[in-house]
Amino acid sequence: MRFDYFDMLSGDPIYLQGVGHLRSPSLHELRPTSGIGYRAYNIYLNFLTWDKEHLLKYDQLMQYRGAHRLNRKCFNTFDVATLLTQTRELCRVVLSFFMLEDLVWDEAHRRYLVMAQDAEEPCVIGEINRDNFDEVRETMLQLNFIGLDKGDAPPVQHSDDKSKELWEKVQGHLKEQAQKESKEDKPEYHLSNIISKICAVHPSYNLLNIYGLTVFQLYDAFFQVSYMRSSDLNEQIFSNHGGDKFKFENWLKPILKNL
């Protein structure tokens, strides 16, 4: 399922029919003292992306009792994630972190029950089972800016052949520099690096207020700033060399597709 871009950008929990409210965590929740820490967050994300084979390898690596019996064709990813007590509890913790409600395991029906928050009496509002587990995981990853069709930044529209030539020279230089860098030196989309870059160039966000953003909002701001910088460079080329192909509305093009 694809949530609306507007809804994901709002930062509010979003209701998934038959399940509950999914959410993108705020950066506050990832801090080492007041949150779960960045390392734990990465573990949670990795868990959401694991397929059946990854889970089997994890259970065997941890040497959980009974792990060797899970490699059966009749078991899907949800089954492998929940048949062993240790992995089932990890799965519950991970899913709960990206939801507004708490989860309780229902052994009789082999499913997670989604419990209403702040209810006077226990109230089930949804469930996560072997039939909707993949959809829930995919949607949670979307809210963390993973699995979205970003592609490259929208192509810059050149005003004339001269501006195109200058643009290609700049891009060629950047590509050449990137090839010279070692693998360790290549820019990474780590949250720490993105937070630092946004705080350095954004007119409003700084280290005092940026942690109020959700993960989705941070990545969106980062890619928007990157695209705007490309648009600004193209406008500078146009202002110096002119041309009749330049369109001022190019900066309005969305960076996300199919939303």
Protein language model features and the residues they cover:
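Long, intrinsically disordered, low-complexity Ser/Thr/Pro-rich regulatory/activation regions
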Residues: 238-259
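Hydrophobic, aromatic-lined core segments that form the binding pocket/scaffold
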Residues: 79-184
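An amphipathic, hydrophobic-aromatic interaction surface with interspersed Lys/Arg
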Residues: 1-69, 141-234
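N-terminal leader/propeptide segments of preproteins
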Residues: 11, 24-126
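Short coil/turn linker and secondary-structure boundary residues
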Residues: 128-131, 189, 205, 213, ...
